[in-house]
Structures are given as C-alpha cells and as structure tokens.
Amino acid sequence: MSHSACPKPATARHSQALTGEIRIPGDKSISHRSFMFGGLASGKTRITGLLEGEDVINTGRAMQAMGARIRKEGDVWIINGVGNGCLLQPEAPLDFGNAGTGARLTMGLVGTYDMKTSFIGDASLSKRPMGRVLNPLREMGVQVEAAEGDRMPLTLIGPRTANPIAYRVPMASAQVKSAVLLAGLNTPGVTTVIEPVMTRDHTEKMLQGFGADLTVETDKDGVRHIRIVGQGKLTGQTIDVPGDPSSTAFPLVAALLVEGSDVTIRNVLMNPTRTGLILTLQEMGADIEIIDPRLAGGEDVADLRVKASKLKGVVVPPERAPSMIDEYPVLAIAASFAEGETVMDGLDELRVKESDRLAAVARGLEANGVDCTEGEMSLTVRGRPGGKGLGGGTVGTHLDHRIAMSFLVMGLASEKPVTVDDSTMIATSFPEFMGMMAGLGAKIAESGAE
C-alpha cells in the first residue's frame, strides 16, 4: 500500500479542554517482537493488545511467508510457530512497507539461515541505512547483495553454518543489538553483544521469556554484555502487550498544552528505557500523576493522569536520547509553548529515521512561527506561553507518522490552525489517533472533511 499515491492533508484547530479516559494501542516494539518470536517458537503463542498498525502486520506477513501460522480469533492473535532453526526460505521478497524495526530485526533473524531472503520496502524505508545491521551479519558469514549505500532492496545469502561473534554496538541502537541477538539464535555457540549505552531492552526480556539461554551482565563502567547461546529451544508464550509510550506522547502533550485539560491514559508501558519524555516533561513542570504502577509480563506498566500545565524550558541531557528518541518531535511542540528556552542535544539518530526528523521538525516549527535553531545534532526552541501568535503554517510530513501527529497536537493549542500535508501514514503506528483525539474533544479534521 503506497502512502504517496493519495495524500490526505489534515488540520488541527484551537480546542477547548480535552477530557476523558483512553487506552493507547499496544507498544510497537513489543508487538513486532511478539509476532517474530511467536512465529519462531515451538507450540502456540497467544497475543492480546497487539498494535495492528501496518508496520506490525507486515512483520506478521513476513513470518507467515517463512512458515509460521498466524490467525486472529476475536481479540486474540494465535500463532503456531515453526520452532527455532526451522524457518523456511520465503518464495517472494519480504515487503516491510515503512517498517524499519520489522525489516532490521528480520534481517538478523533470517541472516544466519542457509537460505536466500530478499527484502523490499516503500520509498521512505528504501532510503534508510541498513549497513549498521548488515555489518555484524557479514562478520557472521552472511553475504549481502544490496542497493548502493547498503540500502533496500537487498538480498541476504546465509552461510551453511554461521560464526558466533562478539559485537560492540557502535551507536545507541536497539535495532542493531536485537538483530545480532536474533542472528545468534540460529548460530552455534555463544553470540555476544557489547552495549556501551543501554537502549530499550524488550528483545532481551522477551527472548528470556520464550526460553532462550540469554544472560546480561553490566560491568563496572556500566557497559552491558549480553550473551545468547544459539540453537536452543523457544517455547510459545501468552503475551498481553502494554500501551505504546511513543504513541502515548501525543495525547499526553496535547493534554498538557490545551487549557483546562484533564486526561487519564490507561495501561502505559513504563519500561525505564522508554520513559525519557515523561521525566523531561516533569522537569518542565508538567502535572503527570503516575497511578497504580504494576508489573505485567515482566514489563513495568502504569496509568497516567495528565492535567494542563504551564511549562518552562529545560536543557535535556544528551544521554537521555536513547530513552526518548521517537519523542523529540512532540517534545519540541511542548517546548514551543514553554516559557524560555529548551535545548535538545545528541539527536544524530533523528537524521536517519522515517525522514530526516530533525530537519522536518525544525522546518515545521519555523512554518508555524516558532523561534528555533537547528544544529548538526541539536535543536533549541524558544517558546511562547499560551501559543500566542503560533500556527498558521502547513507542515511537510515526508511520509513520517510522528511528524504528522506532533504538528496536529500543536494546532490544538496554537492561536491559528496547523495543517499537515498528509495524514495517511499515521496508520503505520497509531491507526486510532484521529478518532481517539476527537473523543477527548480535539478539533482535528482531514481537509475536505470540514
């Protein structure tokens, strides 16, 4: 399904208080991995709360193409997995659409199989660098035929038997770490990932839950050493996917910015590797109450009650970036309404997301009257409390769902409306966004649907 075929602009207007209670769709990271590990494990995996966005569904289709049986009964997804080491060579290229996570993790998963697997994606995914995942796979004996710059479309030709490696991850990337660990599942011996900066750890937690022989040690310098023993048995599990903190960010920031708002968000994943945004907003003065913190399936979960707040600018520590990398666009929106200056640094990973997300945010802010400075790896925003004089612009989304949702949130609190040039790709991560926001009282309409 091509997003570029028929763009749907949307406009958000100044709204009255947002009120109500919502439950956010399932976490995208955990949903991708649930399909992958369920498809790989022996026996049956049952999943509730799965995020049914296009990206995750594409991962499910890829697992089906390699032998997993996946069906939905009511609200439950049921997977009959093939067993570790038993994936089949797909007959056609695996199409991941817009899904960088699905593509990169699956490259790791299948790379060490003695078979040939081809990967394709949409225009946005085909621009994104895959070398970061392909380089460790090459060390394990995988041959790669790729478009220029290690981009898709690409084909992996696996070795007869893969070599286990010890790999030091050169950037803070959960996808690279995960790809190497998944490659280790079908590799004899011990595969080790050395991670200097901790990133989201869903792969480690979930693989242990499925029965993989995986250990994590942190040395005296805080460097994590993750070891996986290959060719072990994985067994199907029951998974209830908690709400995605990256999707939670949009209604959460909207509730902070729209005067008089009071919104409760249920069942949000509070894994410490994912809560950088909440911490930062609290430092800015946000009224966010964490209710009933609990454990579900080995993950921290809580409900959040969010009330409209007067925010002040802060300096965000660069080392916090891995725990909120997807939330900077909507943080920049919050900063636009804060008193004073907000400085965000260490944002180099944003340059290689669905779009050059840093540039896209800066252009969008400028188009809507925000005083901001874009650096090589940084963004500084000087806010206007109350959103006075903000809005009135149209934002280029560059096929990026998070840019689209962030600027629609902006329009709810700015003086003048904000338009995004396309809203179709919101369906990749948060298909319910428009309806859920409208239910809270947000004025968002697709253009032509006024």
UniProtKB/Swiss-Prot annotation:
Keywords, comma-separated and alphabetical: Amino-acid biosynthesis, Aromatic amino acid biosynthesis, Cytoplasm, Transferase
Binding site for phosphoenolpyruvate: 28, 100, 128, 175, 357, 402
Active site positions, chain numbering: 326
Pfam families, alphabetized: EPSP_synthase (PF00275)
Reactions performed catalytically: 3-phosphoshikimate + phosphoenolpyruvate = 5-O-(1-carboxyvinyl)-3-phosphoshikimate + phosphate
GO biological process: amino acid biosynthetic process; aromatic amino acid family biosynthetic process; chorismate biosynthetic process
Enzyme Commission no: 2.5.1.19
Binding site for 3-phosphoshikimate: 28-29, 33, 173, 175, 326, 353
Gene Ontology CC terms, in alphabetical order: cytoplasm
A single GO molecular function term of this UniProt record: 3-phosphoshikimate 1-carboxyvinyltransferase activity
Domain of life: Bacteria
Subcellular location: Cytoplasm
CDD domains (UniProt xref): EPSP_synthase (cd01556)
Subunit structure: Monomer.
Family named by the database record: Belongs to the EPSP synthase family.
The protein's role, per its UniProt record: Catalyzes the transfer of the enolpyruvyl moiety of phosphoenolpyruvate (PEP) to the 5-hydroxyl of shikimate-3-phosphate (S3P) to produce enolpyruvyl shikimate-3-phosphate and inorganic phosphate.
UniProt-recorded name of the protein: 3-phosphoshikimate 1-carboxyvinyltransferase
Lineage of the species this protein comes from: Bacteria, Pseudomonadati, Pseudomonadota, Alphaproteobacteria, Hyphomicrobiales
Gene name of this polypeptide: aroA
